[in-house]
């Protein structure tokens, strides 16, 4: 837990124990399709495996008809025969060939998972064949990308915007997988006055975001947060502020005219 004290205020920043996937609560631009034997990752889908997914995306690009099926079967046979004894595996060669066709209609990025003392995800390889590997893709149709950013045809600049937005969504999901989710509680004179949860990302960046939700006069408290792991110290700080509040109330009571006190009591 991080804590900062300034005047009558005490700000506490701590992990959010109720983690909700950003894929469930946020509107997202890209669609994340993942396949893993132990974890349910990304967005929900009905594909049996990655081959089923790529096949459907391929047919969606060339056409879900007899001609499309024949083109698919012909492509698989040709690529398989060419790369059966080449440097690429036959499976990878077929995947690459399908993705090349799929790219005519969709913008895709690969998704890699690191599974070592926790989970992490990104769109580039972790270069760790033992504990990481590709688990799927995030994609968006070019049509939806044009609607999002405006424009009549896909350009390199628009493609980059689409890819960057999908990368940002993967980064948010990565924070969720890592458990990088936080919230704050703001106390005044020992009494909770404000709180907000669900901030995701690197803690330093999260604290800057939290400042936007704090009242004026408290925003700079995020710059003075310090690690505080002793519950007794935290409780002592809150009790100290509560005592100040009680003392202030007592002094106000002492200076209140007796007639007013009696009237208030009635």
Language-model regions, residue ranges each:
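Acidic interaction surfaces
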Residues: 1-266
């Amino acid at each position: 837990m991080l804590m900062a004290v300034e005047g009558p205020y005490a700000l506490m920043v701590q992990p959010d124990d109720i983690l909700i996937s950003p894929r469930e609560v946020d509107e997202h631009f890209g669609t994340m399709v993942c396949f893993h034997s132990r974890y349910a990752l990304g967005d929900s889908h009905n594909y049996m495996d990655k081959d089923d997914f790529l096949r459907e995306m391929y047919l969606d690009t060339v056409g879900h008809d007899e001609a499309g099926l024949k083109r698919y079967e012909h492509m698989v046979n040709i690529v398989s025969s060419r790369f059966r004894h080449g440097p690429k595996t036959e499976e990878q060669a077929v995947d690459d060939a399908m993705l090349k066709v799929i790219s005519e209609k969709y913008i895709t990025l690969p998704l890699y998972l690191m599974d070592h003392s926790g989970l992490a995800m990104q769109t580039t390889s972790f270069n760790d064949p033992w504990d990481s590997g590709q688990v799927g893709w995030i994609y968006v149709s070019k049509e939806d990308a044009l609607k999002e950013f405006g424009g009549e045809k896909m350009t390199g600049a628009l493609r980059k915007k689409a890819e960057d937005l999908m990368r940002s969504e993967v980064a948010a999901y990565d924070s969720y997988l890592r458990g990088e989710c936080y919230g704050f509680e703001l106390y005044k004179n020992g009494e909770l006055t404000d709180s907000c949860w669900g901030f995701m990302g690197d803690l330093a960046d999260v604290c800057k975001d939290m400042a936007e939700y704090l009242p004026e006069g408290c925003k700079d408290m995020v710059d003075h947060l310090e690690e505080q792991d002793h519950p007794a110290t935290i409780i002592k700080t809150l009790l100290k502020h509560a005592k100040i509040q009680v003392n202030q109330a007592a002094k106000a009571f002492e200076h209140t005219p007796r007639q007013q006190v009696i009237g208030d009591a009635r």
